[in-house]
């Protein structure tokens, strides 16, 4: 796989959750060889960095914690992606926590024509479909997809130029599902493969379902939370959940996603090197390499 250009957006965001270190994900992946991977597949690499928010004045528990900081990052990220998005090349966003998923979807939507169909593949242990009213934690990294479909604080939902719909989403790997999220998935009939489903039917069938679902869509956006992978392989992440996707299946998933002609943007999120650096970082790089068809 070869591109004229790959745009890499570093997003050092930690305020969608409470654990320090996830903002250093881009820096540590670069240290482990991420830029070398990009240089193997692109004639040029265009790096952008989103402004890291200053420490909030108050870190008290609310039902939408650090709203100002999450809002500012997602607005800047949306506008950067809208400017850099290119259907002839690839854009990769490295977080940072998964609250950035709102800005990345918003950026793709903003870059496309108003009637374009944007499909979202959400690889994650969590659906991220909470709202401040039903979130057990108040952490906004559990809310980005809710905001993208129009549920949540107006300051966040308004970041979307227009909302995607629940039918535009395909979940892969979910297994830690809050009550409000379960209601939305069932009520809105959101397509999904739990981690248990993946083990039962095989990742090949998941890929076939993704291709079939998005056959009439204009573009696909992949948001890849590393906690979708089983903690046996991913130690350095803030909210690990047992019984996840195997590393082998994750590498196959990424290699097949990378072959999709409609995929032009990817998020890699929730790598926290302060929790564990080397094993997790190397496995994340393997996933990124597989996306580009590079054998690990």
From Swiss-Prot:
Keywords: Arginine metabolism, Hydrolase, Manganese, Metal-binding. GO terms for cellular component: cytoplasm; cytosol. The keyword Hydrolase applies. One of its GO terms (molecular function) is arginase activity. Optimum pH is 8.5-9. Optimum temperature is 55 degrees Celsius. Active up to 70 degrees Celsius. Mn(2+) 1 binds at residues 124, 126, 225, 227. The keyword Nucleotidyltransferase does not apply. Monomer. Homodimer; dimerization is dispensable for catalytic activity. This is Arginase.
